[in-house]
Amino acid sequence: MKDVIALAKAKESAMIRDLQGWIRCGSVYDETTVSTEKPFGEGVSNALEWMAQTAERDGFMVDRCDGYCTEITYGTSPEIVMVLGHADVVPLGAGWTKEPFGGVVEDRILYGRGASDDKGPTLAAYYALKILKERNYPLKRTIRIVVGGNEESGSRCLHHYFQELQRPHPIYGFTPDAEFPLIYGEKGIMNYRFQGEIHDDVLHYLHSGVAANSVPDSAIAHLVGHTFSAHQFESFLRQAGTTGSLEINKDQAILTVHGKAAHGSTPEHGLNALSLLLKFLAEHTTSSLAKHFASKFLAYDGSGLDIQFSGERMGALTMNLGLGSYENGHYSFILNIRYPIDCDPHILSQTLGQHALHKGELMSDSAPLYLDPESPFIQTLLRIYQELSGDKKTQPMTIGGGTYARNTVNTIAYGMGFPNGGHGSGNIHSPDESLAIDDLVLGTAIYLRALFELANM
């Protein structure tokens, strides 16, 4: 197979049009529109249907999988090479300067929620398969693309696909939902909640966060009977390197603290507005809730909760306080924890429970993933990336992020994020999420060769 970059480049305009159309299907999970036919709500259902109709347009076999996934198949061999992408996106959050569901292109960069996570990369893999089909390249194995609808909030889509529908697992697979060159290991992912009923003399209302796996970029609290001054609040914000607002009306106050959004697997890249707000309340008010939890949530290494841990193969545990609320006497804080393969999740959960004020609850736990980085499968994908990108410096890695790879076998994360943001892609889970057109083309070329070689190994 020669000149795959030219083959991908020839599809550039069509890919841009299709990606814009897909992004316009705003596909945040919406519980209010969930039904039997639309298990993740109307927006996600529309995005899955868009992909189904696009594949039918191009002559592929399509299965809608009870509304949980869109399955696209090329070939009839029982041995399957699989691509796992997703159509759902995280909530928007604040701070966008582009239309979030517009897909606008400026200076060869396409903006929109889902541009790089994960509609753009999934579409790149789809166009790679489309090129293979159109040019009738010989393939020994079936290639199947499965587009899920619930990656960002539990992966119930793939549970339904593999467990309920009993669809076959792949011989080889990859998900275009992380970084190049490739990810051969993923930390375990635990969601843990502290909750209970409490009467707080000062705190009347608290809200922050859009998802457990995102660093909150804003937090708001309503107080009654506060004793701090505006100067103290302003000084706190300056020292924290952030901004906020304060409204005072007699003995009542509304505080807002701004932070910086980031993916929950890399809390060090963000600034957690919720943990900062709790810190201020603990230091400058008599809030019993803040005083109990503030110091526990500050450090993203988990040291405040005695769960700090570092492993030889995957590095250190990280913790993100993703969601927090207090209303009508009920509080809830949800932690998103990424732990290495050497860390015992049972001990981790038990240790967290010891810090509960009322109730600690293990919400979910997904075990770590680890494949041999020296295997022929992984070395093949690495070689293809290096040959087409020219990048022989960046090494395969393990990550704290969780992808679809852990839901099946013989599957890793393979792109589509390029080192150092490629040509301008990024802001995953943040405002102005983007995908550079040049990265879209190169990613498509890499996936084209990868699918061809994996299907013929």
Regions found by a protein language model. Name each.
Residues 80-147, 153-154, 166-168, 426-439:
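Active-site metal-coordination/substrate-binding segment of hydrolases
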Residues 159-340:
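Midchain, well-structured core segments that form catalytic/ion-binding scaffolds
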